[in-house]
Amino acid sequence: MKDTYISEAVKYIGADDTTLDLFESQYQIPNGVSYNSYVILDEKVAVMDTIDERKTDEWFANLENVLNGRMVDYLVISHLEPDHAANIKRAADKFPQAQLVLSAKAKAMLPQFFDIAHLDERCLVVKEGDTLELGIHKLHFVMAPMVHWPEVMVEYEETEKILFSADGFGKFGALSAEEEWTDEARRYFINIVGKYGVQVQTLLKKAAALDIQTICPLHGPVLKENLGFYIGKYLTWSSYEPEEDGVLVACASIHGNTKAAAEKMVEVLRANGASKVVFMDLTRDDMAEAVADAFRYGKIILAAASYDAGVFPPMEDFLHRLVHKNLQKRTFGLIENGSWAPCAAKGMKGILEGMKEVNICENVVSIKSTMKDTDVAKMEELAKEILA
């Protein structure tokens, strides 16, 4: 279990979810996920977000335990997505004296989710640079629109130098899971927030002006040490620069012949000095991990079967995800297969040309049904070009 202790005045009241199969009904989470929420205990009590309704009872139990009979003065709403906001109405009803602290956009969106009586009187709308004094503790509000919803804000507590970062610096994986941070944080960032790199960069510039000693995200562990490492990862991911040198070989094969060619391409790349080669079978491997690997490495080989005069759907799905997540600044190589009219390369190239700052290798490997020695020779040429 990850350490959730923050301080005597700032408490963790979130919960792990280890039975949810798909996050956002699309992303595999074999090690679950945490829904994080926090309480600041001072002259005034502030609750920092709620959690998913799957863990409502646990959240209220944790909250009551920390409050020890005290009442809530403020419920700070950083983000209205239901995995963080599901219990806003329940909390508002339970603590009728509490003010809801939120951005103007969040106030406008709130009635779409909940019918809260006397909403105007209950809301304390804050904007960029506003502060809220709780006693010794003082919250500064920083707007973070489109990271990754329009109403999002983060909060900086100046006394203990804590950044409550909303979905920023989150990761997949329950706190009970024993795993390192980077891989599941990368997969989370790329697939949840990746499209909004410019907005993340804007937020990081604001954060750079703050003296941050602890980061409290809405998913994943509380970050207390080596914060420069985590911030550095976010700077790289949000700038769309490759994280490390290497080649991703992603294939979509119908009967196995295209996969055999892709596996041979892996061998050829290694023989030609590739520092690292990663293979993903898009028909069976986790698509979200494949997308994350495309962000991780600067060079990508795509191997796809032709299908219905186009591209085999798993590859088409993968490429559209890359476009949707705004991948850019990459070099691509293409391998196609077709028994009578290979056309996958043309289809893949058409999608890639919609991306920013991409280079597509001139050498294209076009296979007729099964791999031949002449195809391997073409792979050698492609390997030399993409590794140059």
Where are these regions (language model features)?
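Metallo-beta-lactamase
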Residues: T4-E8, L102-V152, Y196-T202
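Active-site metal-binding motif and surrounding structural segment of the metallo-beta-lactamase
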Residues: E43, R54-V101
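FMN-binding flavodoxin-like domain, especially the glycine-rich phosphate-binding loop
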Residues: L175-I215, H219-V222, K264-M280, A290-A388
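Short, charged N-terminal beta->alpha structural module
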Residues: A250-N272
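Conserved beta-strand hairpin/beta-sheet module of binuclear metal-dependent hydrolase folds
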Residues: D3-E64, V154-E157, K161-S165, T258
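Active-site neighborhood of phospho(di)ester-bond hydrolases with catalytic His/Asp-centered motifs
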Residues: M48-T50, V72-L80, L100-S103, L163-D167, ...
